[in-house]
Amino acid sequence: MRTHTLGFPRIGGNRELKKAVEDYWKGAATRQQLEDAARAIRLRNWTLQREAGIDVVPVGDFALYDHILDAALLLGVIPPRFRNDDAPRDIDLMFRMARGQGGDRPVAPLEMTKWFDTNYHYLVPELDAATTFAPDAAPLLALIDEALAAGFTPKAVLPGPMTFLWLSKRVDGGTRWSLLPALLDAYGALLRDVAARCPLIQLDEPILSLDLADDIRSRFVPAYARLRVAVPDATLLLASYFAPVGDNLPVALSLPVDVVHLDLVRGPEDLTPALDILTRAAARQPADSGLPQSGSQSGIALSLGVINGRNVWRVDADKAAAPVRAAVAALGPDRVWVAPSCSLLHCPVDLDAETGLDPEVAQWLAFARQKCAEVRLVADMCDLNGRADAPETAAALARNRAALAARAASPVIHDPAVAVRAGTVTPEMGWRATPYTARIAAQRAALRLPVLPATTIGSFPQTVDIRAQRRKLRTGQITEAQYDAAMREAIATAIREQEALGLDVLVHGEPERNDMVEYFGEQLRGFCITANGWVQSYGTRCVKPPLLYGDVARPGPMTVRWITHAQSLTQKPVKGMLTGPVTIACWSFVRDDVPRPVVFRQLALAIRDEVADLEAAGIGVIQIDEPALREGLPLRRAAHAAYLDAAVGAFRLASSGVRDATQIHTHMCYCDFHDIIDHVAALDADVISLEASRSRMELLDVFATHAYPNEVGPGVYDIHSPRVPSIDEMETLLRAASRVLPLDRLWANPDCGLKTRDWPETRASLAHLVAAATRVREGG
């Protein structure tokens, strides 16, 4: 029985990668210094895994920006605007594709979107009829050599060809699948080079956890047959995760691979049919038949993902061991591997760094390093060669059971008052008093905005001084009063800047918020905050999800004093800025002892109370951000309705207790709305803003097809790139939007908040946005 991981956090225990990459971008570090920092992180990652008991470490899971971008470069998928005959395929090209910066002029970066149903974002490879794959395994081979030289047993990790193509975009409108034969040739060449140094290769095919059309599913077997011909002697591990493989299981287990990984956290129901398929295959092919076992059903091993790779709660080792024992009984220990459910990319690195957590809560947790030890514990519990009875196994199991028992009995988890409040909710509380078509007149009379009003999404640059003030407060160098004064001045600066730019609806800029979810987690009961529990969101952007461990309640107002201060400084409307209940849940590490709809409702009631306080304080525009609503959608359609009903109900419960004249906004990120547009409309937000610039407004088509009735603010510039788009570029996007939706139902805004940008580029971009909106408004 072997232990392995599908991937490990790449940011470093103290976000060393973020600092190294950003220093390189600023010219404060050389390429050699960046490469040295990356090498040190990889070595530390491999060492932590081996010390925790992992037999085989992943190589290729590490990326300076994004692993799908790395795969595109390995395959030579480089769009023409990034090509330069004299430029090598190196990290500068990679960063240019990610950010649009570098070279002789700024260009539009690759589109970015969510990685399945997680809060990680990947860069979308671009394909067209002229795409020619040019594989070059050298970067991956260098990493393999690095691991071998350090004495590790490596497993090369690559996205599988079917998933790579699925995640890519045909920019010329053609079908992606016409490029599959050429892509398989490129993969075959890559795998041949890799297998010569590292015969164990993991190919990630998470699209096997989706509802696949028959014509897509049918391509898997011939595709993998070609790969097997390319590397007949390699050990191929096919990995799927994030949902049950379900009806794709017969295909997955018929592929000519040696190991198939199943996510038994998200898809425990996959185990029984998988064992049935494999044991029946073995019965049909006797061991002495003389036929090759490798790559046939009768010889396939199962990698069982029994440790949750997406949450931070300590595993129930007894529960996790049960499917492993069942697999060992059916297949034998040599055909069973133990692993986390998915890459540990989605977890913080090391719980040992959290010295300030409440010890009671800390004992319930496991971060990436601890999850590796949990993999080892579960494997040892199921070992047939003596480890199950070893004293160290017994001691680790005793600690695990004690922690779980303590959590179950803890009085800090349950708040009777929260249950009483939830019991008072009525269906009428989830509906506005009148439909949008009736209340829009009251809002326009109250707000007196021009056609195509210009606004921003919420946050403004978090300057060095703002971050320093927060750090000084945390370390006791300044008082609360001094901190409040500094934040009020930052808010005043944001208001002055917006008025000078000519924006129509202003925001306070959120200087007091370190993160749009963590800020609320700090003020709501039922949460605790880590000091170093960072996870990667995209590139160098890291987030620190709060830990939602118990019933949620709001002790008092959370945002009112900041928003009312901002409103006192201007005659223009200032938006109240809140994070919605679904996003708070999706972007937190959420308790696993109650159903998700229970958490949604508790959070919705807390936000509802905050909305009421903002309205009572005279705030006429209130934005409740739900960027994670689409992200939280289960991958399988069978689970969609229950999730969407709970999510929409939570948003409406949070937002519907206001007068007609109060305008409710929401914001969503990187979404494909086609399959949920009815539910987006059911939110009944007066205005929805969304990220649309990288897709060149393609996202709006669904709003026209659906005849979406309310107002829309399509993002007209990408805030994830430092590039300042021109007035003409934004005008073109706004005019494209006006061909889809009437001008009197459109807003002009950036794609997202401006927290990560600097003031010079923010001023320039917003000035261009206002100018573009004015042109379109005046030109009709």
From Swiss-Prot:
5-methyltetrahydropteroyltri-L-glutamate binds at residues 15-18, 114, 541-542, 587, 631. Its EC number is 2.1.1.14. GO terms for biological process: methionine biosynthetic process; methylation. It catalyses: 5-methyltetrahydropteroyltri-L-glutamate + L-homocysteine = tetrahydropteroyltri-L-glutamate + L-methionine. Zn(2+) binds at residues 667, 669, 691, 752. Pfam families: Meth_synt_1, Meth_synt_2. Keywords: Amino-acid biosynthesis, Metal-binding, Methionine biosynthesis, Methyltransferase, Repeat, Transferase, Zinc. InterPro entries: Cbl-indep_Met_Synth_N, Cobalamin-indep_Met_synthase, Met_Synth_C/arc, UROD/MetE-like_sf. Belongs to the vitamin-B12 independent methionine synthase family. Catalyzes the transfer of a methyl group from 5-methyltetrahydrofolate to homocysteine resulting in methionine formation. This is 5-methyltetrahydropteroyltriglutamate--homocysteine methyltransferase. It comes from Nitratidesulfovibrio vulgaris (strain DSM 19637 / Miyazaki F).
